[in-house]
C-alpha cells in the first residue's frame, strides 16, 4: 500500500480531531465535527480550507505568454495587468479536459499556475512536452515549497486583514480574479488572490510552507473556522463549480461540461484541442437538477452516476448532494442537448424513478439562493 501524501498542515488537522480521508492519494480532513456547521460558517461568516495538496507551478521565460496562448483553451490575451487571473481548461488534442486550472499573470516573463492535486504530475509532464515541442525555452518549476489556505465567506477578507495587516493595503482594492504579492509579513512573502471555490467572497493565500501552520493558527484565533472537504464539496456544488475527475475528465469536452464560457474561440489562436472542439461542437447539455418533493418529502438524495431519464434519451448525474442552504437535493447532470430549463426529468434512485426539475446553474451565490 502506498503511503498517503501529507500537507504541511496534517498535524494541525489531527490536533483539531479532524476526520481524515484518502483524497486522491492525500491524507485530508473531510470535517472537524460538523460538516453542516462548516458549510454555514462559509455562507454566513468565514471558513478556511487547507488546499495545499494543489500544486503551484511557476513558468518563466520570454515566450511564456505565447506558450499559454497555445496550451490553454481560454485566452491569456485577457491578462493585461499584473496579478490578473484566468480560469481555463487544459485540453488534449481530442478536446478532452486534462485539468482545469487558474493561471496568474505577473510579468511578461513570469506566469503562475495552480493545478489540481490528482493531476499535477500529468499536467507538468504535458506542459514540459508542449514546451519542448514548441521550442518555447521556458523554465517550469513546481513549487512544493508553497502551501495554500483558502479563506472564504462574507467576512473572510476582513479576517485575513486582521491576521495579516500588511495585506490590507495591497488587496483592499483587488477585484475578483486578481492577486497581489504581499512581501515581508510575519508569514513570509504571500500571494493573496481574490478567488475561491465556494461561491462566496474571500482570498486564496499562497504562503511559504514553513509558515503555513502559524498562518492557520492565527486565522483560527481571529475567528476563521477550519472546514473540510465535505463542506468544500457542498459549497462548490451549490455554487455550480465543477470538480475535475467527476464532472469532466480527458474523455469529456468542456463544451459538454458547462464550461463553454472558459473556451475562447473568438481569437485566431491555434490552441491544443481547438480543431476537435470546432469539429464536434456541443453534444450534450450540462444542467442543474433539483429533486422534487412529494407530500413535502424527497424520496432520496441525488448522487453521482445515477441515471437521468428524459424524453430525449438518457443522461447521467455527475455530482449530487443534499444542499444545506436550500434544504433540497441538488445535482449536476449531463443530459441530451434537447433538454430545456424547467423540464421535469426522472432520476433512477434504487428501484424508483423520481422527478427532478432542470434548472440553470449556479444554485447559490454570495449566500443567495438563485435556483428556484
UniProtKB/Swiss-Prot annotation:
EC category name: transferase
UniProt KW Translocase keyword: no
Gene Ontology CC entries for this record: cytosol; glycine cleavage complex
Coiled-coil segments on the chain, per record: none
Alphabetically ordered keywords of this record: Aminotransferase, Transferase
Its EC number(s): 2.1.2.10
Enzymatic reactions: N(6)-[(R)-S(8)-aminomethyldihydrolipoyl]-L-lysyl-[protein] + (6S)-5,6,7,8-tetrahydrofolate = N(6)-[(R)-dihydrolipoyl]-L-lysyl-[protein] + (6R)-5,10-methylene-5,6,7,8-tetrahydrofolate + NH4(+)
GO molecular function: aminomethyltransferase activity; transaminase activity
InterPro entries from the UniProt entry: GCS_T, GCS_T_bac, GCST_C, GCV_T_N, GcvT/YgfZ/DmdA, GcvT/YgfZ_C, TrmE/GcvT_dom1
Name of the protein described by the UniProt record: Aminomethyltransferase
Name of the coding gene: gcvT
Lineage: Bacteria, Pseudomonadati, Pseudomonadota, Betaproteobacteria, Burkholderiales
Pfam families named in the record: GCV_T, GCV_T_C
Record has Transferase as a keyword: yes
Domain of life, source organism: Bacteria
Family the UniProt entry places it in: Belongs to the GcvT family.
Assembly notes: The glycine cleavage system is composed of four proteins: P, T, L and H.
Known function: The glycine cleavage system catalyzes the degradation of glycine.
Biological processes per GO annotation: glycine decarboxylation via glycine cleavage system
SUPFAM superfamilies: Aminomethyltransferase beta-barrel domain, Folate-binding domain
Amino acid at each position: 500500500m502506498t503511503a498517503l501524501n501529507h500537507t504541511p498542515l496534517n498535524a494541525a488537522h489531527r490536533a483539531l480531531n479532524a476526520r481524515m480521508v484518502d483524497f486522491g492519494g492525500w491524507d485530508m480532513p473531510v470535517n472537524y465535527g460538523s460538516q453542516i456547521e462548516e458549510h454555514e460558517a462559509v455562507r454566513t461568516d468565514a471558513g478556511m480550507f487547507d488546499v495545499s495538496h494543489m500544486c503551484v507551478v511557476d513558468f518563466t521565460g520570454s515566450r511564456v505568454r505565447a506558450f499559454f496562448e497555445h496550451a490553454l483553451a481560454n485566452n491569456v490575451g485577457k491578462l493585461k495587468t499584473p496579478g490578473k487571473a484566468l480560469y481555463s481548461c487544459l485540453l488534449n488534442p481530442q478536446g478532452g479536459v486534462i485539468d482545469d486550472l487558474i493561471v496568474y499573470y505577473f510579468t511578461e516573463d513570469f506566469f503562475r499556475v495552480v493545478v489540481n492535486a490528482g493531476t499535477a504530475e500529468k499536467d507538468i509532464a504535458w506542459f514540459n512536452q508542449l514546451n519542448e515541442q514548441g521550442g518555447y525555452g521556458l523554465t517550469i518549476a513546481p513549487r512544493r515549497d508553497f502551501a495554500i489556505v483558502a479563506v472564504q465567506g462574507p467576512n473572510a477578507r476582513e479576517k485575513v486583514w486582521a491576521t495579516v495587516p500588511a495585506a490590507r493595503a495591497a488587496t483592499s482594492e483587488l477585484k475578483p480574479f486578481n492577486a497581489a504579492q504581499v512581501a515581508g509579513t510575519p508569514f513570509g512573502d504571500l500571494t493573496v488572490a481574490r478567488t475561491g471555490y465556494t461561491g462566496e467572497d474571500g482570498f486564496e493565500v499562497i504562503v511559504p510552507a514553513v509558515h503555513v501552520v502559524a498562518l492557520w493558527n492565527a486565522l483560527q484565533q481571529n475567528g476563521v473556522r477550519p472546514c473540510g472537504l465535505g463542506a468544500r464539496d457542498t459549497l462548490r456544488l451549490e455554487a455550480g463549480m465543477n470538480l475535475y475527475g467527476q464532472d469532466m475528465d480527458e474523455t469529456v469536452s468542456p463544451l459538454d461540461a458547462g464550461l463553454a464560457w472558459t473556451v475562447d474561440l473568438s481569437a485566431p489562436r491555434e490552441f491544443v484541442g481547438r480543431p476537435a472542439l470546432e469539429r464536434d461542437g456541443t453534444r450534450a447539455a450540462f444542467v442543474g437538477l433539483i429533486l422534487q418533493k412529494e407530500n413535502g418529502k424527497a424520496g432520496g438524495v441525488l448522487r453521482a452516476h445515477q441515471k437521468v431519464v428524459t424524453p430525449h434519451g438518457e443522461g447521467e448525474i455527475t455530482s449530487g448532494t443534499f444542499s444545506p442552504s436550500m434544504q433540497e437535493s441538488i445535482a449536476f447532470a449531463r443530459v441530451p442537448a434537447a433538454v430545456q430549463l424547467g423540464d421535469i426529468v426522472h432520476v433512477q434512485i434504487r428501484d424508483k424513478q423520481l422527478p427532478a426539475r432542470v434548472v440553470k446553474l449556479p444554485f447559490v451565490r454570495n449566500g443567495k439562493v438563485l435556483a428556484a
